Curated annotation (Swiss-Prot):
It is a multi-pass membrane protein. It comes from Dictyostelium discoideum (Social amoeba). The chain crosses the membrane at residues 26-46, 324-344, 360-380, 384-404, 445-465, 474-496. Belongs to the CLPTM1 family. It comes from the Eukaryota. Residues 9-21 have a biased composition (Low complexity). The gene is cnrB. This is CLPTM1-like membrane protein cnrB. Keywords: Membrane, Transmembrane, Transmembrane helix.
């Protein structure tokens, strides 16, 4: 969005989908997560402030769930302090059973570990054990499988032997992946069946890892002081809470899941155990809640359809980058979002107050509006998340509004139906001058380059890529051209600046904000690991930015005047008109005085000539 720098300044914001593609995803991911985490914490604060929390005092007490979520424990609101029922360092054992029922444990023991201690000793980190077993017809036909984790400790002082039970599903049901496209030029065989896609059809996926943790926490909680975010995980009995068994799926990505069908003959699972602290556990579950909320709002990508979610990309970024890069990325992403907002705000302000199209390229604005429409259709055809789709649709409406400010739109309505019969786009009077002449000239030269590129990329895509339909081919070919060559569509504005020898008509405040974001994008293009060609694609739009800077240098703007389209600019314009009017009146007065003087001289010369003639006659 920002790589075009000042070029985009006069013509609106670049689509968000293109921003995510050009930045390799990292800037878009972090910016998106920052917004959603802010929304999440604001909403949490509002609910806790005005609606109360789940652990407020009430006459009926607080209901807490235990680890397996099957029973509840009611704790009176005036209960004593809650302490851990397991002392530090006590030995325990852990067993994992597999069962097709979430209620019956059965006798299928697959993992067992003795003499574990409830503390931070290194001996509590158990190496991964791989278990492989044959699949059954039940599992191959969307059957379920559960892991029953049973943790037991010996009797301690006056406390009896304790046993914890956690049930964890190993099968998850997700929508069936969408079928891939086809080569539209290949002839379809008559014997080949027609594949129909049902978005409501679910298939089973196998979780190949089971990471077990026992949360080490010896905090003594005063009454009603357990954080509401974790209160549902506690199992409390007689003023004591039991340790929490945590099945960690935070690092389980969508791509790790294995589909289970008739062709799968064996399944394997890796089981490991280690201790985990309360802070780390809370951090993981809070972050996972934020990511889940983002996906529920439609901002998680197409993970259910087979693609990687934004949450998975964010987690992968945490593991693949150094901490200092993550910290720098977070700070710069916040600045990036602020500059983006300021650029958008000032861009809207400029076009709202702009009264003249002199020096501005209407063709470039029209092209940008068409590009935004193409990208919106492409995102709609690919069933992109609602968040990205709404952002792109809003951007298209903004560009159409700017087109309405640049031109006069005349709508003729039908007499029988409330539908438009004809829509006319009429250029404004200020534009019908040298600006339009230069704009048409630049568009003619640009079309010589643009049309062959569109045709060439479309033919290449038709031969070598797969598409769902002919409509998808047309839209994807157009959007590929937009993503690849959109930067050259700003050349008409450069051409107009060159011909008019002026850049004062451009919104330079918007230009500066987007220029800062351009530097940020270029910085991350070299910090973040990505292919060389992708880095060059991030730098190519800087050509337009550099040309704009050069034009700004050779065509300086009077700093005492505002050319931003604001109220100050209108006052300056009115003052200029007043000064010009006064100068014109002065010149007219001077002309009148000169004419009167000439008339007087003519009259004097005429009278003197008459006197001379009279004297001559007398002589």
């Amino acid at each position: 969005m920002n790589n075009q720098g000042g070029a985009v300044a006069a013509n609106g914001q670049r689509p968000q989908a293109q921003q995510q593609q050009q930045q390799g995803g990292i800037m878009g991911i972090i910016s998106t997560l920052i917004r959603f985490m802010a929304i999440y914490y604001i909403a949490s604060f509002a609910f806790s402030k005005f609606l109360g929390t789940g652990n407020n005092n009430n006459n009926g007490g607080v209901v807490l769930n235990n680890n397996n979520g099957t029973t509840n424990t009611s704790i009176p609101s005036n209960s004593v302090r809650l302490a851990n029922s397991w002392p530090e360092g006590i030995e325990f054992n852990m067993k994992v059973y597999l069962s097709t029922s979430n209620e019956t444990v059965g006798d299928w023991l697959v993992w067992e570990q003795d003499k574990l201690s409830y503390d931070w000793k290194d001996s509590n980190t158990i190496p991964t054990k791989n278990i492989t077993f044959d699949t059954t017809p039940y599992l191959q036909n969307n059957g379920s499988l559960f892991a029953h984790i049973i943790t037991s400790r010996r009797a301690y002082l006056n406390q009896p032997k304790s046993q914890l039970h956690k049930v964890h599903p190993l099968i998850v049901y997700l929508p069936k992946p969408k079928p891939k496209g086809k080569n539209l030029l290949e002839e379809k065989s008559k014997d080949e069946p027609e594949v129909e896609y049902d978005p409501t059809e679910l298939i089973s996926y196998w979780k190949p890892t089971l990471s077990l943790h026992l949360i080490v926490d010896h905090t003594i909680y005063p009454p009603d002081s357990i954080p509401k975010e974790i209160v549902s995980y506690f199992n409390i009995t007689n003023g004591f809470y039991s340790p929490i068994i945590y099945c960690n799926e935070f690092w389980l990505y969508r791509e790790h899941l294995k589909p289970v069908n008739e062709t799968v003959k064996q399944l394997s699972i890796e089981i490991n155990y280690s201790s985990m602290g309360l802070f780390k556990w809370q951090l993981q579950i809070q972050m996972q809640k934020s990511l889940d909320m983002q996906e529920s709002f439609g901002g998680g990508g197409n993970s259910a359809m087979g693609g990687a979610s934004v949450g998975d990309e964010f987690k992968r970024m945490l593991t693949d980058n150094d901490p200092w890069i993550l910290g720098l990325t977070l700070i710069v992403s916040v600045l990036h979002t602020i500059f983006e907002f300021l650029a958008f705000k000032n861009d809207i302000q400029f076009w709202k107050n702009n009264k003249s199209m002199e020096g501005l390229s209407v063709k470039t604005i029209t092209l940008n509006c068409v590009c935004m429409g193409i990208i919106f259709l492409y995102l709609l055809d690919n069933e992109t998340s609602y968040m990205i789709l709404a952002s792109s649709g809003f951007g298209f409406l903004v560009e159409f509004w700017k087109l309405g400010k640049a031109m006069t739109i005349k709508i003729t309505w039908m007499t029988s139906l409330p539908l438009p019969k004809r829509i006319e786009f009429i250029n404004k009077d200020e534009y019908m001058s040298k600006t339009k002449q230069y704009d048409d000239m630049a568009m003619k030269y640009l079309s010589w380059l643009l049309f062959p590129l569109v045709i060439g990329t479309s033919i290449y895509s038709l031969y070598y890529h797969e598409h769902k339909s002919w409509y998808s081919w047309v839209v994807s070919s157009l959007v590929r051209t937009v993503y690849t060559f959109e930067f050259i569509m700003m050349t008409p504005q450069l051409f107009i600046n060159y011909k008019l020898k002026s850049v004062s008509h451009l919104p330079w405040r918007v230009f500066m904000y987007r220029a800062l974001n351009t530097f940020i994008d270029d910085l991350f293009a070299f910090i973040i690991k990505m292919p060389l060609l992708h880095r060059l694609s991030c730098l190519r739009d800087d050509i337009i930015f550099i040309v704009y800077l050069y034009q700004r240098w050779i065509y300086p703007v009077d700093k005492k005047r505002s050319h931003y389209g604001s109220e100050e600019a209108e006052e300056v314009q009115q003052q200029d008109k007043k000064e010009i009017k006064e100068k014109v009146e002065e010149r007219e007065e001077e002309k009148q005085e000169e004419e009167e003087e000439e008339k007087e001289k003519e009259e004097e010369s005429t009278s003197s000539s008459k006197v001379t003639k009279r004297k001559t006659k007398k002589v």
